[in-house]
Amino acid sequence: MMDSRGRPLIVVDPTTLSRSPAYGHFLMAHECCHHTLGHVRRLYDGIGQLGPQPFYYIRPQLKQMELDADTCAVKLLKATHETEAISAARETMLSFGTKPTGAYYPTGIERADNIAKTAAQD
């Protein structure tokens, strides 16, 4: 998300952060990664607003953006030795099972597998 001046914003439900601080660390890293990877700018460049509903024409890209942000977040958390946050993220994604984790997003299983694969890399 961007503010009215085009500055990056991250909006997170505080309940999510208080309910599971470990998952909250992952979530914040994940959202930061969307900004650093250029995903947010891409959504605001116009194409994300075309079509019968928001993001309709970039829905295949949205799935990959989520996986890329997960990968980036795991790498950040590994670098700071926050293995509990990585585990919490995987467990949270597994709770979605074969259902998508959001509109046009990967399934929980896909995201959990991606998190585990990234965490296992050196």
Each language-model region and where it sits:
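Catalytic zinc-binding patch centered on the HExxH motif and its immediate surroundings
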Residues: M1-L9
